[in-house]
Amino acid sequence: MKKIWLALAGLVLAFSASAAQYEDGKQYTTLEKPVAGAPQVLEFFSFFCPHCYQFEEVLHISDNVKKKLPEGVKMTKYHVNFMGGDLGKELTQAWAVAMALGVEDKVTVPLFEGVQKTQTIRSASDIRDVFINAGIKGEEYDAAWNSFVVKSLVAQQEKAAADVQLRGVPAMFVNGKYQLNPQGMDTSNMDVFVQQYADTVKYLSEKK
């Protein structure tokens, strides 16, 4: 009986220690106004944002978060309009096209690099070329660009950003209740930071 009690006590302590790793106001913050019906895990980004580029291409935050998510929990990525002027809005629509066609993974890197690294993306035509070079037919892209589905996805992205009163990117939200706070995480080591970020998302996705 004593051994069983000690084992149970150990489990309780382990659980308490695990929960204590995550503190509201440290690794995450609770939204004042929860957003009903928000995607389970929602990341906002811009192809114009240098930190978003780092998150995607250097730290691989999205990939690491996806690996940690419980079964059945989906991650969604939305592009924002408030960077890049008119071209930023074109990229939000292009991201809606990517979502509609299911080609996000094919165009993410070339769009980031075309905007920030090579600076070869300067117009809607340049964006279209990225999709064609990624294997999407021009007529398929054009049909999607002008479709009701894409227009709806653009509106959906804009509404989601307004609902959480988004101030900057990159930003990640969980269940419309919590926002990740990278500044409250361990940044002394890149791998540790990425691990803590992904673990925090997992914790919040399971939080009742």
Swiss-Prot record:
Major subcellular site: periplasm
The keyword Signal belongs to this UniProt entry's keyword annotation: yes
Signal peptide (UniProt feature, chain positions): 1-19
CDD domains in the record: DsbA_DsbA
Disulphide-bonded residues: C49-C52
Compartment annotation: Periplasm
The keyword Acyltransferase appears for this protein: no
Domain Thioredoxin span(s) in chain numbering: 20-150
InterPro entries from the UniProt entry: DSBA-like_thioredoxin_dom, DsbA/DsbL, Thiol_disulfide_DsbA, Thioredoxin-like_sf, Thioredoxin_CS, Thioredoxin_domain
Family the UniProt entry places it in: Belongs to the thioredoxin family. DsbA subfamily.
UniProt cross-references to NCBIfam families, sorted A to Z: PRK10954.1 (NF008198)
Function: Required for disulfide bond formation in some periplasmic proteins such as PhoA or OmpA. Acts by transferring its disulfide bond to other proteins and is reduced in the process. DsbA is reoxidized by DsbB. It is required for pilus biogenesis.
Name of the protein in question: Thiol:disulfide interchange protein DsbA
Record organism: Escherichia coli O6:H1 (strain CFT073 / ATCC 700928 / UPEC)
Lineage: Bacteria, Pseudomonadati, Pseudomonadota, Gammaproteobacteria, Enterobacterales
